């Protein structure tokens, strides 16, 4: 989040970072920011994942189909989608162009919701479209959750693998993995990249770690947020269906088209729920 911009928004509206802890508070804050500034509050890199986790937290059960998409008859999943879609339809949030950090750094949005590794790509300065600049004062928070229930978090990452080869090379590959994931070395590695540690011991050492890169305070906030999520949230793996991510790409491309027109139609008086239903129809059309 652009901390400099958020400070002005907070002073004008009373919205604080604590209000972003829940999805309800997040979307409410997004509406208030839009009313105050006329701009979207947040660009989401992976909105379908946010919808999934929110639905699961509400007790949706399994909402995947045999062909690797979504059960559009699952009412809880749909309502989770509609919560996001109503905000999108009014211009309160947007699907990011690809990665939200670019839109945050140009002041097009105040915040971004995406991977922890995005911290690598933030500048120290926000440069607005009119050429004015101010310090980013980057603030990092845990992902919102549903109020009053056990929180979930997404689990995604990069795996290490080795080709089937000679016994000697296989032993060397295993030795490398053990070397790379030793507690201190693992923490040194991930602290430069924004990734989560893979060892319990590395997580335990985060609070006293003193070798974060600049901006140190932002990295400290990131790892404090990751530590909080690890301690309090249940990880959920991402879908692995064949062809799934091609469908997600089609969904996001369609949403980017719709978000160019829906806010103006909402402002002109069209029913927000009806506009949100257009995004649901898009999701339902993907097979």
Predicted regions, residues:
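Aromatic-glycine-rich donor-binding/catalytic loop that engages nucleotide-sugar donors
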Residues: 4-18, 90
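Short helices/loops that flank or line small-molecule/ion binding pockets
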Residues: 28-32, 98-112, 253, 257-260
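Paired acidic/hydrophobic, glycine-rich loop segments that form the ligand-binding mouth/hinge
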Residues: 110-115, 120-122
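Glycine-centered hinge/linker elements that transmit conformational signals in sensory
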Residues: 27-34, 66-97, 138, 143
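Conserved C-terminal helix/tail region of periplasmic/extracytoplasmic solute-binding proteins
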Residues: 214, 220, 224-287
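Short, solvent-exposed loop/beta-turn-alpha elements that line the ligand-binding surface or hinge
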Residues: 16-19, 61-79, 130-132, 145-151, ...
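Extracytoplasmic/periplasmic substrate-recognition and gating elements
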Residues: 85-92, 129-201
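Extracytoplasmic/periplasmic solute-binding protein
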Residues: 7, 23-70
